[in-house]
Amino acid sequence: MMSMNSKQPHFAMHPTLPEHKYPSLHSSSEAIRRACLPTPPLQSNLFASLDETLLARAEALAAVDIAVSQGKSHPFKPDATYHTMNSVPCTSTSTVPLAHHHHHHHHHQALEPGDLLDHISSPSLALMAGAGGAGAAAGGGGAHDGPGGGGGPGGGGGPGGGPGGGGGGGPGGGGGGPGGGLLGGSAHPHPHMHSLGHLSHPAAAAAMNMPSGLPHPGLVAAAAHHGAAAAAAAAAAGQVAAASAAAAVVGAAGLASICDSDTDPRELEAFAERFKQRRIKLGVTQADVGSALANLKIPGVGSLSQSTICRFESLTLSHNNMIALKPILQAWLEEAEGAQREKMNKPELFNGGEKKRKRTSIAAPEKRSLEAYFAVQPRPSSEKIAAIAEKLDLKKNVVRVWFCNQRQKQKRMKFSATY
């Protein structure tokens, strides 16, 4: 390992510490070197009764105790512990293998309790902890068999290579190299934890770079929110459309009912008969009705001829013309009846104006009733004429004149039959 470290370039971010600040390093390194070297023949001769392996272990423990007692006044371990201070910074993973031929170069070994306390209480490492991430980023990751990372504080790990090398150096140092992962090599006190560092890197990468097939939770929430709003907006629009459609259906139904009542032939026939009777009762001729329509001031409606009113009453107009003329004649009839009521309420105002008596026209039903009464009694009394007039809603004078005219008619018919 000494030769391997001497061939590698140094990427230290900070200047290396001079060796003259550590005067007690040589004694501790000498003690550890004695522990690592084979037992001399002289010692085997002096302690022939003891096993050589037990002696070697005892000397190793003594060397470790010396190193611990001397290392309490120094924040860093001796040069011999790390083989060289210029190549690798102090980390919790780079300790001297006591049995060098039994350990692979990339295995991590735990620190002794005294060394761990020294590293934790070191003020230099406390200052370097803040720059751990920057050191790891600047140190970079080594290749598979190269050094683990840069030599700066908080940079890459020790000289261990391979896929698991290149761990983060120092507390807070990031992962270095392709084998470091997010959990650096110094953060793995156990060899199994070192493999977890490699597993954590793709997991974090997958968390950082989400696959395109899985949408972001925020985007999913936003899409759900807009979808609900959209759904809500679509439901409100559907309710408005349904309400408007229902109103349109109701309006169409009402209009259809009105149109049906207006366009029903039986309704038109009943109105035409009613209009004729009320017109006769008012004493107005068909020509007067046609000329009076211009006084209604209805847009697009002027005076009509007498033949048009006659055809309306006799139902000989076309169906569309009957439908168009019905509201006009109804308006005139209401106005004429209103004027008639006013005239009856104030008869003195209209007596001077009536000079010519209008010819009375009797409707067919009333005419048939009068003919039936005439067949029974051609000469009724005055009381009988008054009762007939009241029953048929006609004037008494009209009924009297009709009976008189009917007798004259029958006389002419008899005279023509005789001669």
UniProtKB/Swiss-Prot annotation:
GO terms for molecular function: chromatin binding; DNA-binding transcription activator activity, RNA polymerase II-specific; DNA-binding transcription factor activity, RNA polymerase II-specific; DNA-binding transcription repressor activity, RNA polymerase II-specific; GTPase binding; RNA polymerase II cis-regulatory region sequence-specific DNA binding; RNA polymerase II-specific DNA-binding transcription factor binding; sequence-specific DNA binding. InterPro entries: HD, Homeobox_CS, Homeodomain-like_sf, Lambda_DNA-bd_dom_sf, POU, POU_dom, POU_domain_TF. One of its GO terms (cellular component) is nucleus. Gene3D superfamilies: Homeodomain-like (1.10.10.60), lambda repressor-like DNA-binding domains (1.10.260.40). It is found in: Nucleus; Cytoplasm. Pfam families: Homeodomain, Pou. It comes from the Eukaryota. Residues 131-184 have a biased composition (Gly residues). Keywords: Cytoplasm, Developmental protein, Disease variant, DNA-binding, Homeobox, Intellectual disability, Nucleus, Transcription, Transcription regulation. A motif (POU-IV box) lies at residues 57-66. Residues 99-108 have a biased composition (Basic residues). Expressed in the brain and the retina. Present in the developing brain, spinal cord and eye. Residues 356-415 bind DNA. The keyword Transcription regulation applies. Residues 94-117, 131-197 are annotated as: Disordered. GO terms for biological process: axonogenesis; cell migration in hindbrain; cellular response to cytokine stimulus; cellular response to estradiol stimulus; central nervous system neuron differentiation; habenula development; heart development; innervation. Residues 261-338 form the POU-specific domain. It is linked to Ataxia, intention tremor, and hypotonia syndrome, childhood-onset: An autosomal dominant neurodevelopmental disorder characterized by global developmental delay, mildly impaired intellectual development with speech delay or learning disabilities, delayed walking due to ataxia, intention tremor, and hypotonia apparent from early childhood. Brain imaging shows cerebellar atrophy in some patients. The C-terminal domain is able to act as both DNA-binding domain and a transcriptional activator. The N-terminal domain is also required for transactivation activity on some target genes acting as a discrete activation domain. Neurite outgrowth and expression of genes required for synapse formation are primarily dependent on the C-terminal domain, however the N-terminal domain is required for maximal induction. Interacts (via N-terminus) with RIT2; the interaction controls POU4F1 transactivation activity on some neuronal target genes. Isoform 1 interacts with POU4F2; this interaction inhibits both POU4F1 DNA-binding and transcriptional activities. Isoform 1 interacts (C-terminus) with ESR1 (via DNA-binding domain); this interaction decreases the estrogen receptor ESR1 transcriptional activity in a DNA- and ligand 17-beta-estradiol-independent manner. Multifunctional transcription factor with different regions mediating its different effects. Acts by binding (via its C-terminal domain) to sequences related to the consensus octamer motif 5'-ATGCAAAT-3' in the regulatory regions of its target genes. Regulates the expression of specific genes involved in differentiation and survival within a subset of neuronal lineages. It has been shown that activation of some of these genes requires its N-terminal domain, maybe through a neuronal-specific cofactor. Belongs to the POU transcription factor family. Class-4 subfamily. This is POU domain, class 4, transcription factor 1. It comes from Homo sapiens (Human).
